[in-house]
From Swiss-Prot:
The keyword Transferase applies. It catalyses: D-arabinose 5-phosphate + phosphoenolpyruvate + H2O = 3-deoxy-alpha-D-manno-2-octulosonate-8-phosphate + phosphate. GO terms for cellular component: cytoplasm. This is 2-dehydro-3-deoxyphosphooctonate aldolase. The gene is kdsA. It is found in: Cytoplasm. Its main location: cytoplasm. Its EC number is 2.5.1.55. InterPro entries: Aldolase_TIM (IPR013785), DAHP1/KDSA (IPR006218), KDO8P_synthase (IPR006269). It comes from the Bacteria. It comes from Photobacterium profundum (strain SS9). Belongs to the KdsA family. Gene3D superfamilies: Aldolase class I. HAMAP family: KDO8P_synth (MF_00056).
């Protein structure tokens, strides 16, 4: 049986054979007050349920479909908000970067820096992120097969950073349709020699209008998809929630309703406990 790697985010163990970690929050920082409200709710729920938690938000959505779409407050203001969240709630933070110059300043504040799916093969960006020594979350590109993630992990290892988490977010099947291949989780584990795999259930539910300027979504299918992913035995779940999804400034159609967070996570935790309590069956 292949040994599963453990990546440490502060005092949190992230591994495929350990209790799942929630990487949850909001899509983009809309305001300081909303970030505080959403983070507080996540902290209350995860503390109650005993779920390890890392808060997620973006300071700049640099890859929006339309030039007119809201991008966020920017790095300087975003890092101030992240620091306040850490000071207030004691949470770990994950956020994404898009430019080489952002790597070190962001790593100085947050606990995990994320390599966006569209940039996952950009070697110069990979090198800059690796050199910070931070934990890295790699979003698997929609165009990449599960087995190819091993090459990205190798790039980070060549730069002396093996603190890598891999994130599945669906693959393109035809135009504008994302599908999650549940067999892909095991392929990713093997290709990366046991790296922790997490599942971005929110973005996997995006459904684009081929002529539109923003992504649609299928948030009503979040529970089914999340259960399916967790049932494969993975390290964590990645999700975004909002108190009023239809008013969210980015990816509202796939955002999870914040008031449904506790019953949802309660089910996911029970399922994760059940799956990881089974004796492994090895088939050659």
């Amino acid at each position: 049986m292949m040994e599963q790697k453990t990546v440490r985010v502060g005092d949190i163990d992230v591994a495929n054979d350990k209790p799942f970690v929630l990487f949850g929050g909001m899509n983009v920082l809309e305001s300081r007050d909303l970030a505080m409200k959403i983070c507080e709710h996540y902290v209350e729920v995860t503390n109650k349920l005993g779920i390890p938690f890392v808060f997620k938000a973006s300071f700049d959505k640099a890859n929006r479909s339309s030039v007119h779409s809201y991008r966020g407050p920017g790095m300087e203001e975003g890092l101030k908000i992240f620091q306040e969240l850490k000071d207030t709630f004691g949470v770990k933070i994950i956020t994404d970067i898009h430019e080489i110059y952002q790597a070190q300043p962001v790593a100085d504040v947050v606990d995990v820096i994320q390599l966006p799916a569209f940039l996952a093969r950009q070697t110069d960006l990979v090198e800059a992120m690796a050199k910070t020594g931070a934990v890295i979350n790699v979003k698997k590109p929609q165009y990449m097969s599960p087995g190819q993630v091993g090459n990205i992990v190798e790039k980070f290892a060549e730069c002396d950073n093996e603190n890598v988490i891999l994130c599945e977010r669906g693959a393109l099947h035809g135009y504008d349709n994302l599908v999650v291949d549940m067999l892909g989780f095991d392929v990713m584990k093997k290709a990366s020699k046991g790296s922790p795999i997490i599942f971005d259930v929110t973005h996997a539910l995006q459904c684009r209008d081929p002529l539109g300027a923003a992504s649609g979504g299928r948030r009503e299918q979040t529970v089914d998809l999340a259960r399916s992913g967790i049932a494969t035995g993975i390290a964590g779940l990645f999700m975004e929630a909002h108190p009023a999804p239809d008013q969210a400034r980015c990816d509202g159609p796939s955002a999870f309703p914040l008031d449904k967070l506790e019953p949802f996570l309660n089910q996911i935790k029970q399922l994760d406990d059940l799956i990881k309590g089974f004796e492994a069956i090895e088939i050659n």
